Amino acid sequence: MQKLADFKLPQFFNYPPYFTLQPVRDTREKQIQLWKELILDYCKSQKIFLIGVEEDFPLFSNSAIDRSLSHEARETFLSAIVGEGRAEWLDKGHRKCLILWHRIQDWADIVLQFVRDNGLEDSVMTVEEIRSGTESLGTELQGIDRTILMRALKLLENKGKLALFKGTSADDEGVKFSV
């Protein structure tokens, strides 16, 4: 089985027709489903949050079979993920896609579990400490995209689980947990 870094690629990745949008509806639906799963699994395993449709992305080509996804195929597969609420287009031209391998609510739950696991109830942290502090090392929060983290924190703020406060810069933004 072919690997990309430490990620095992599925069998279909070596099947040339899967790099071309299939004309038969049932086959295309299966193709889209396989690509959605592959993109989400790969992004989660590699902690990738942004995909540029026009940029080099390891899954968009397979040199072993000399195949690459067309722009249309890339946009189709990413749009299918967007349609499931697992990604969002960051621009009207569909050039950049924010990948949500966890939905925002799930990220919010991960933050709450992180707070409980580390005894941080009624504590204050900066947003950067949540992303890259000692407590986050080895957790799913380590290196989380700032946009995703802020949306999860705002969701928790709306539920009364924390208070966000501004510092003098983005690095100083604070979080007061009240779990």
Swiss-Prot record:
Which PANTHER family does the record match to this protein? Answer: VACUOLAR PROTEIN SORTING-ASSOCIATED PROTEIN VPS25, VACUOLAR PROTEIN-SORTING-ASSOCIATED PROTEIN 25
The species is Arabidopsis thaliana (Mouse-ear cress)
GO cellular component terms, A-Z: ESCRT II complex
Q: Quaternary form? A: Component of the ESCRT-II complex (endosomal sorting complex required for transport II), composed of VPS22, VPS25 and VPS36.
UniProt name for this protein: Vacuolar protein sorting-associated protein 25
Q: InterPro entries this protein is in?
A: ESCRT-II_cplx_Vps25-sub (IPR008570), ESCRT-II_cplx_Vps25-sub_N (IPR014041), WH-like_DNA-bd_sf (IPR036388), WH_DNA-bd_sf (IPR036390)
Which Pfam family name is an example for this entry?
Answer: ESCRT-II
Main location, first listed in the record: other
Family to which the UniProt record says this protein belongs: Belongs to the VPS25 family.
Q: Where in the cell is it found?
A: Endosome
| GO biological processes | multivesicular body sorting pathway; protein transport
Q: Which gene encodes it?
A: VPS25
Function statement: Component of the ESCRT-II complex (endosomal sorting complex required for transport II), which is required for multivesicular body (MVB) formation and sorting of endosomal cargo proteins into MVBs. The ESCRT-II complex is probably involved in the recruitment of the ESCRT-III complex.
Q: Which UniProt keywords apply?
A: Endosome, Protein transport, Transport
